[in-house]
Amino acid sequence: MPEIRRRPHGPILEKPALKNPTATLRRLLGYLRPHTFTLIMVFVFVTVSSILGVLSPYLIGKTIDVVFVPRRFDLLPRYMLILGTIYALTSLLFWLQGKIMLTLSQDVVFRLRKELFEKLQRVPVGFFDRTPHGDIISRVINDVDNINNVLGNSIIQFFSGIVTLAGAVIMMFRVNVILSLVTLSIVPLTVLITQIVSSQTRKYFYENQRVLGQLNGIIEEDISGLTVIKLFTREEKEMEKFDRVNESLRKVGTKAQIFSGVLPPLMNMVNNLGFALISGFGGWLALKDIITVGTIATFIGYSRQFTRPLNELSNQFNMIQMALASAERIFEILDLEEEKDDPDAVELREVRGEIEFKNVWFSYDKKKPVLKDITFHIKPGQKVALVGPTGSGKTTIVNLLMRFYDVDRGQILVDGIDIRKIKRSSLRSSIGIVLQDTILFSTTVKENLKYGNPGATDEEIKEAAKLTHSDHFIKHLPEGYETVLTDNGEDLSQGQRQLLAITRAFLANPKILILDEATSNVDTKTEKSIQAAMWKLMEGKTSIIIAHRLNTIKNADLIIVLRDGEIVEMGKHDELIQKRGFYYELFTSQYGLVVEKE
């Protein structure tokens, strides 16, 4: 069911920084559980390749001591063959594990996007009122992509790093304890530097993703409203607004990159310090004939292996931080409270269309009431018009009837049942609606018309189109009913889009019909034809009509007049005119008529 127009109330889901990266990481890794066997296979490949990698420095040291120092070059081919085989196997295993992890990460991304999209179908409408649409799109697309970029590489590097570190430490202590302790002396400094830098960069990467969502929101809004922007020559103002947010993104992005960019050179400095210590102590031990030159070469190799995982982590650091920030933003949506039916909610069966509002109060922000003590009763089959100036509460009444929002106080009943005791899907499927702002989808004309009644036949579709006088222009489209519409039917005129929306409501054939400014975008001739067909359509249906042009609702069974969220008058057209009240003022202000009391 399409949504009635709503009022935005500013963004939600804004937090100053990433709260708990450990919990976020743990939850993100939970998406890998279905792939446990695949991960075990990858970890076996990683373990074997890491062990082979750990052996290479030892073999290089042995080659120096066995081949080059005693000048036994006849043994060189044997050692070269062994080293070459190790390097070849290591490369093959790295390729295999990378290929598997990239496939696995794509599956995780698929599941995340699927869960996000399904969640967005179940959250209350108020969430979309308060959250910029571009920010939501950014979470579904950009934030999930950030996670994909990290999962494909970082998990392998993390596990490979652990195995390599463990293997390197074991081999170093087997070769020489003193040089092993010298190599490990740089670890506390490495951990300290990483902790200091990470605590600063985490908040900037979260802020970077939040501002990126704002920028996406501006782009999405400007593209959809480009005609209005050009009409009012607001291009410069829109560019200024874009520049402000873009500048904020530049600043926060620069800070994030600067802070994260500090880590690699600092780690490089620590690594060089480790090499210097090994070379210095190793040279001193070699002069005393405690170790050989090959042992020094072995330790330099192990030192590189020991620091390589730390270096890789620092190089991936900004991606990891961004992925954690993105995961936090994704989980914020996944943790939103969903629209839930009452445990005892019932299905509407054999809908009669009786509607009753009892002392209904409502406010969007829980502060200023939009509706105040609204009470009225609509009998089955009645045609009721809601009339009032902009902001009087007409659309809000429809929002509440559709249960896009729940009342603060009072009751709304359909067929004598409180709508909070009716399943939302059952309630909404009983109501057909024509929006003021027509919503069409990027599919064929026929599929758009069938949206409220997927089982409609081609004959039923054409009959409904003839009733609404839309058949004549549909037949002249390039592919007729099979013509694929562009974004929201922008290749059609506003009147044509309105006619398609009316036809869609015809096909749905609900017991309750809501017409929100149904003919406000149609020319006078077409409007008269539609009005005749529409009154015929409304026979036997409970119909609620919202219209500012009061001449379209003269024949309504009941007119409810609203002002500032309150009902000020109710009655038929002639009765209200004779009262010379607020409705009389509205009517005469539109048509310049002075109607004498009889």
From Swiss-Prot:
Principal place where this protein is found?
membrane
Which GO annotations describe the biological process of this protein? Answer: transmembrane transport
Which GO MF term does the entry hold, naming one? Answer: ATP hydrolysis activity
Annotated Gene Ontology cellular component terms: plasma membrane
Which family is this sequence assigned to?
Belongs to the ABC transporter superfamily.
InterPro entries given in the database record: AAA+_ATPase, ABC1_TM_dom, ABC1_TM_sf, ABC_transporter-like_ATP-bd, P-loop_NTPase, Type_1_exporter
Answer whether the UniProt record assigns the keyword Transmembrane to this protein. Answer: yes
Annotated membrane-spanning segments are: 40-60, 80-100, 150-170, 177-197, 273-293
Lineage top rank: taxon: Bacteria
Tell where it localizes: Cell membrane
Q: Where does ATP bind?
A: G388, P389, T390, G391, S392, G393, K394, T395
| Pfam family of the protein (one) | ABC_membrane
Q: Residues in domain ABC transmembrane type-1?
A: 39-322
Please state every residue range assigned to the domain named ABC transporter: 355-589
Q: Which UniProt keywords apply?
A: ATP-binding, Cell membrane, Membrane, Nucleotide-binding, Transmembrane, Transmembrane helix, Transport
Protein name (Swiss-Prot/TrEMBL):
Uncharacterized ABC transporter ATP-binding protein TM_0288
Q: How does it sit in the membrane?
A: Multi-pass membrane protein
